[in-house]
């Protein structure tokens, strides 16, 4: 039987939600991930250090016994985020980054940034203290086609930020296009990107051809096959700028299977297994460990995990749904099989 032992991986982009749902999301992600960068787009969002630390405590209270899982917290940037708040967050030792959500770009982003110039003082402070800048890279102009919003963001906004803040460490989150791959590859060593398992495994045909499959609907939206292939090539290249970020984002079944369904795909139930499938599809299993376990902590200047997990090439059945607080979430690959499992 084929096996693969790798250093324990981390997830550098996940949504754990809050309240009753936390028990289920934390259980899933802590099975084999050592750490996770936890997104702050709650209701209300984690816009200050105090709120982020309270959220940290709620997550830690739900980590199963025996697990060493550690959440890494993120500030939600607003037009009013101050340099002092950035310094306070950095000094806490628990907040590792601040996140740009262009107002209206994705789930719970209404409190986000309306004009980039409003956060320039905060970005100056982040550059000064060494706090990472995480970016949801899509424009929100309704006149821009949804499939072009990442490319336009890179051309019109991100390129300027990189120029204006050359010493700021930036992660372009959940990239979906060849444009993003090329930009990150050519940028300085201070620019990196996360890639999701679902963007490696699927493209827009999977979501739209032969019927609409709402559980593939996420933001940034799945793109055409040529972009999917560029993402696979980047992930499997060994380039240290690309690393694992699931963007696992649970929504209740009835919020997805609706006339106006929510954006987000749930993959925390089988994240590393899905990545193993993706890497195997391009004969690059030997590159999985660096992508999943080395590149992220190296970019964040954190130690790599010291223990290991073992993946086994053995198919298993994915349930039709998983519990999510007082409701249920339909995961990616629901009712189907995944080729790999953690031993």
UniProtKB/Swiss-Prot annotation:
Cofactor binding note of this UniProt entry: Binds 2 Zn(2+) ions per subunit.
Organism domain of life: Bacteria
Catalysis performed (reactions): (S)-dihydroorotate + H2O = N-carbamoyl-L-aspartate + H(+)
Residue numbers binding Zn(2+) 1: 13, 15, 99, 247
Residues given in the record as Zn(2+) 2 binding sites: 99, 136, 174
One example of a Gene Ontology biological process annotation: 'de novo' pyrimidine nucleobase biosynthetic process
Enzyme class: hydrolase
Cofactor: Zn(2+)
Protein keywords: Hydrolase, Metal-binding, Pyrimidine biosynthesis, Zinc
GO CC, one annotated term: cytosol
Residue numbers binding substrate: 15-17, 41, 136, 219, 251, 263
Record EC number: 3.5.2.3
InterPro entries the UniProt entry points to: Amidohydro-rel (IPR006680), DHOdimr (IPR004721), Dihydroorotase_CS (IPR002195), Metal_Hydrolase (IPR032466)
Molecular function as annotated in GO: dihydroorotase activity; zinc ion binding
Active-site residues, as the UniProt record annotates them: 247
Modified residues (N6-carboxylysine): 99
Keyword set includes Transport: no
Pathway: Pyrimidine metabolism; UMP biosynthesis via de novo pathway; (S)-dihydroorotate from bicarbonate: step 3/3
Keyword Zinc applies: yes
Family: Belongs to the metallo-dependent hydrolases superfamily. DHOase family. Class II DHOase subfamily.
Subunit (UniProt): Homodimer.
Protein name: Dihydroorotase
Species of provenance: Shewanella oneidensis (strain ATCC 700550 / JCM 31522 / CIP 106686 / LMG 19005 / NCIMB 14063 / MR-1)
């Amino acid at each position: 039987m084929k096996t693969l032992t790798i250093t324990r991986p981390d997830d550098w982009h996940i949504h754990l939600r809050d309240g009753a749902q936390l028990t289920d999301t934390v259980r899933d992600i802590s099975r084999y991930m050592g750490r996770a960068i936890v997104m702050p787009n709650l209701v209300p969002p984690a816009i200050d250090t105090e709120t982020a630390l309270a959220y940290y405590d709620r997550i830690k209270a739900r980590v199963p016994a025996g697990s060493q899982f550690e959440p890494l917290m993120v500030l939600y940037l607003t037009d009013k985020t101050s340099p002092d708040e950035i310094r306070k967050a950095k000094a806490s030792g628990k907040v590792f980054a601040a996140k740009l959500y262009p107002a209206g770009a994705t789930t719970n982003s209404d409190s986000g940034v309306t004009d980039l110039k409003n956060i320039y003082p905060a970005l100056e402070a982040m550059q000064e203290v060494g706090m990472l800048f995480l970016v949801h890279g899509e424009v929100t102009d309704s006149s821009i086609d949804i499939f072009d919003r990442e490319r336009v963001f890179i051309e019109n906004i991100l390129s300027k930020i990189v120029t204006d803040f050359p010493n700021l460490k930036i992660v372009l989150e959940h990239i979906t296009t060849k444009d993003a791959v090329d930009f990150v590859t050519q940028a300085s060593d201070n620019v990196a990107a996360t890639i999701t398992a679902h963007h490696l495994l699927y493209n827009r045909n999977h979501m739209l051809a032969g019927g609409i499959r709402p559980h593939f609907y996420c933001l940034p939206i799945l793109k055409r096959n040529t972009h999917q292939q560029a993402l696979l090539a980047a992930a499997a290249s060994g380039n240290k700028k690309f690393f694992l970020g699931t963007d696992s984002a649970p929504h209740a079944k009835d919020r997805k299977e609706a006339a106006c369904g929510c954006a987000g795909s749930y993959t925390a139930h089988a994240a590393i297994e899905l990545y193993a499938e993706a890497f195997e599809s391009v004969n690059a299993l030997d590159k999985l460990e660096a992508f999943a376990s080395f590149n992220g902590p190296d970019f964040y200047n954190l130690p790599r995990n010291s223990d290991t997990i073992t993946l086994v090439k053995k198919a298993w059945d994915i349930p039709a749904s998983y519990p999510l607080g007082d409701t249920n979430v339909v995961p990616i690959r629901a009712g189907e099989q995944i080729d790999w499992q953690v031993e």
